UniProtKB/Swiss-Prot annotation:
Membrane topology: Peripheral membrane protein
Major place of residence: plastid
Enzyme class per UniProt: translocase
EC nos: 7.1.1.-
Keyword entries, A-Z: Chloroplast, Membrane, NAD, NADP, Plastid, Plastoquinone, Quinone, Thylakoid, Translocase, Transport
Protein name: NAD(P)H-quinone oxidoreductase subunit H, chloroplastic
Record-linked NCBIfam families: PRK06075.1, PRK07415.1
Alphabetized InterPro entries for the sequence: NADH_Q_OxRdtase_suD, NADH_UbQ_OxRdtase_49kDa_CS, NDH1_su_D/H, NiFe-Hase_large
Example GO molecular function: oxidoreductase activity, acting on NAD(P)H, quinone or similar compound as acceptor
Length: 393
């Protein structure tokens, strides 16, 4: 019996779902011809929890603890966007001190998110050492978060019109010490990684996205800036008090996985610059706008009513969302995090649409991996930086 020496059939391989510490519960159905990728189909939804529907049955204050479960590695940003939307709807002013503290927390959260992108990304392409180094610095950031908010993750720190509590005594000095220490840490990463020939072999020229292509796909964040587009919502939308600090938008022209790595590494240095300026120039004054209590809708209690017995319990303020629609957005570590909010003269939102950066950025994955090698899939997927909590919502 004679037969062909080699078979020409295509092979279909399942990649994932992965462990949450790496790429989360993402499943890729990959069609291979030998080691060449012919097609790739991402399967989503394993972490879908109905976050948009839950929002329609909660007041904004009640919904705050839920939002930290979207991107659970950059929780300050999900809180920021959740309070920014009703602040814009109700034209609520945030005190200058609260705005400075918000910026400090947001930039610390950005660094923590980029660190936990860097470690698994390097582990994916075979470098185990940085995976352990990043936890050293990330732990210091979480210590700062714990001192200020009481929680290492899922902080529930932002409030409409300000923040939950002022910074504790000595926190500013500790944070300045961390900034000085972390700059040496970034230099160590760059010395260890950036010019490593094996690392460059794996990332240079892999997963190239052109500037026009990035815009057409709706990409944002480091994915967009690595393709030569200088677009950062902190500069574009002028939210919080970013205009008062001296910093630069980090970008690269090449559009490959190396460019995305360089953008994120540079962003961590810029975040430290912003934090140092905010800490040194932080003004005094209140940390929340007590005027927003006017927006409370508390009905008059009858003396013998059931609610009256629990009047000593501090009620959470409820805000009437005016009958209009609004799109609010912030520059999260992974890209543009937005909320489309429709009010209906009630305390619950009529519609609460989340625009997660990871979900939009992930769309381009099948196009990027076609005609690449199987081993390049993890490099490209890692360079996109997704968290399935916000992709699936």
């Amino acid at each position: 019996m004679t037969g062909p020496a080699t078979r020409k059939d295509l092979m279909i391989v399942n990649m994932g779902p992965h462990h949450p510490s790496m790429h989360g519960v993402l499943r890729l159905i990959v069609t291979l011809d030998g080691e060449d990728v012919i097609d790739c189909e991402p399967i989503l939804g394993y972490l879908h929890r109905g976050m948009e529907k839950i929002a329609e049955n909660r007041t904004i204050i009640q919904y705050l603890p839920y939002v930290t479960r979207w991107d659970y590695l950059a929780t300050m940003f999900t809180e920021a966007i959740t309070v920014n939307a009703p602040e814009q709807l109700g034209n609520i002013q945030v005190p200058k001190r609260a705005s400075y503290i918000r910026v400090i927390m947001l930039e610390l959260s950005r660094i923590a998110s980029h660190l936990l992108w860097l470690g698994p990304f390097m582990a994916d392409i075979g470098a185990q050492t940085p995976f352990f180094y990043i936890f050293r610095e990330r732990e210091l950031i979480y210590d700062l978060f714990e001192a200020a908010t009481g929680m290492r993750m899922m902080h529930n720190f932002f409030r409409i019109g300000g923040i939950a509590a002022d910074l504790p005594h000595g926190w500013i000095d500790k944070c300045l010490d961390f900034c000085d220490y972390f700059l040496t840490g970034i230099a160590e990463y760059q010395k260890l990684i950036t010019r490593n020939p094996i690392f460059l072999e794996r990332v240079e020229g892999v997963g190239i996205i052109g500037g026009e292509e990035a815009i057409n796909w709706g990409l944002s964040g480091p994915m967009l800036r690595a393709s030569g587009i200088q677009w950062d919502l902190r500069k574009v939308d002028h939210y919080e008090c970013y205009d008062e600090f001296d910093w630069e938008v980090q970008w690269q022209n090449e559009g490959d996985s190396l460019a995305r790595y360089l953008v994120r590494i540079s962003e961590m240095t810029e975040s430290i610059k912003i934090i140092q300026q905010a800490l040194e120039g932080i003004p005094g004054g209140p940390y929340e706008n007590l005027e927003i209590r006017r927006f409370d809708r508390v009905k008059d209690t009858v003396w013998n009513e059931f609610d009256y017995r629990f009047i000593s319990k501090k009620p959470s303020p409820t805000f009437e969302l005016s009958k209009q629609e609004l799109y609010a957005r912030v520059e999260a570590p992974k890209g543009e995090l937005g909320i489309f909010l429709i009010g209906d003269k009630g305390v619950f939102p009529w519609r609460y649409k989340i625009r997660p950066p990871g979900f939009i950025n992930l769309q381009i994955l099948p196009q990027l991996v076609k005609r690449m090698k199987l081993a390049d899939i993890m490099t490209i997927l890692g360079s996109i930086d997704i968290i399935m909590g916000e992709v699936d919502r």
